[in-house]
UniProtKB/Swiss-Prot annotation:
Any single Gene Ontology cellular-component annotation: cytosolic large ribosomal subunit
Annotated PANTHER family: RIBOSOMAL PROTEIN L25/GLN-TRNA SYNTHETASE, ANTI-CODON-BINDING DOMAIN-CONTAINING PROTEIN, RIBOSOMAL PROTEIN L25_GLN-TRNA SYNTHETASE, ANTI-CODON-BINDING DOMAIN-CONTAINING PROTEIN
Record's signal peptide: none
InterPro entries named among the record's database cross-references: Rbsml_bL25/Gln-tRNA_synth_N, Ribosomal_bL25/Gln-tRNA_synth, Ribosomal_bL25_b-dom, Ribosomal_bL25_C, Ribosomal_bL25_long, Ribosomal_bL25_short, Ribosomal_L25_dom, Ribosomal_uL5_bac-type
GO molecular function: 5S rRNA binding; structural constituent of ribosome
NCBIfam families on file: bL25_bact_ctc (TIGR00731), PRK05618.1-2 (NF004128), PRK05943.1 (NF004612)
Entry function: This is one of the proteins that binds to the 5S RNA in the ribosome where it forms part of the central protuberance.
SUPFAM superfamilies on file: Ribosomal protein L25-like (SSF50715)
Gene3D superfamilies: Ribosomal protein L25, beta domain (2.170.120.20), Ribosomal Protein L25, Chain P (2.40.240.10)
Name used for this protein in its record: Large ribosomal subunit protein bL25
Gene field: rplY
UniProt keyword annotations, A-Z: Ribonucleoprotein, Ribosomal protein, RNA-binding, rRNA-binding
One of the GO biological process terms: translation
The organism of origin for this protein: Rickettsia rickettsii (strain Sheila Smith)
Family: Belongs to the bacterial ribosomal protein bL25 family. CTC subfamily.
Length: 203
């Protein structure tokens, strides 16, 4: 099961630019929760706390239990507005999680790409997809998808059909797609080219 973050929030009844500025001066961040056919709920969060968690990896796929007026709501971050200079969180959109499954974007981590076989032979690891869209069980939402690519040779593609996803998750699209490739740098020889030239030299 995914790790669930516990956060406290307060309801807010005043809206508009002036009300938002007053909240921020008080060290709080305006936010809203919507979706799942529910009436949107306007809330505020402690600025330091939400900014701290936003700066951690994969916040946008973080499952959260929000406590508002002693009631708990299971939510996911949808969009985050930052201050253009300080990167402090200024506003957050959350979505209610009421369905058994949720469509969401998840970061992809390519483990060992610097040590991949094709890279060692002079190739370049080309990332095509940094995030993928999955349909996930809401109780098992992955923070990211980690793929070990250390054995990936030169001139190959990493395709979605070869990826083992966490239990309860599937790609939204059924069509096969490429996540990453290892391509030859200018002047670098692929393994096949090297073998062919060696064979010709031995004739």
């Amino acid at each position: 099961m995914s790790e669930i973050l516990e956060l406290e929030a307060e309801s807010r009844t005043e809206f508009g630019t002036g009300a938002a500025r007053a909240l921020r001066r008080a060290g709080r961040v305006p936010a809203i929760i919507y979706g799942a056919g529910k009436t949107p709920v306007s809330i505020s969060l402690e600025e330091k706390e939400i900014t701290k968690y936003y700066r951690k990896p994969a916040f946008i796929s973080q499952l959260i239990n929000l406590t508002i007026d002693k009631k708990k709501y299971k939510v996911l971050p949808k969009a985050v507005e930052l201050h253009p200079v300080t990167d402090i969180v200024r506003h957050v959109d959350f979505v209610f999680l009421e369905k058994k499954t949720q469509k969401m974007e998840v970061p992809v981590v390519y483990e060992g790409k610097e040590r991949a076989l094709g890279v060692k032979r002079g190739g370049y690891f080309n990332i095509v997809k940094r995030r993928v869209t999955l349909l996930c069980d809401v109780n098992n939402i992955p923070r990211n998808i980690t793929i070990d690519v250390t054995n990936m040779p030169m001139a190959t593609s990493l395709k979605s059909s070869k990826i083992e996803l966490p239990k309860g998750c599937s790609f939204v699209t059924k069509k096969e797609f490429v996540l990453a490739t290892i391509i030859g740098r200018r002047g670098a020889k692929t393994e096949a080219e090297g073998e062919q030239q060696a064979a010709e030299a031995g004739k």
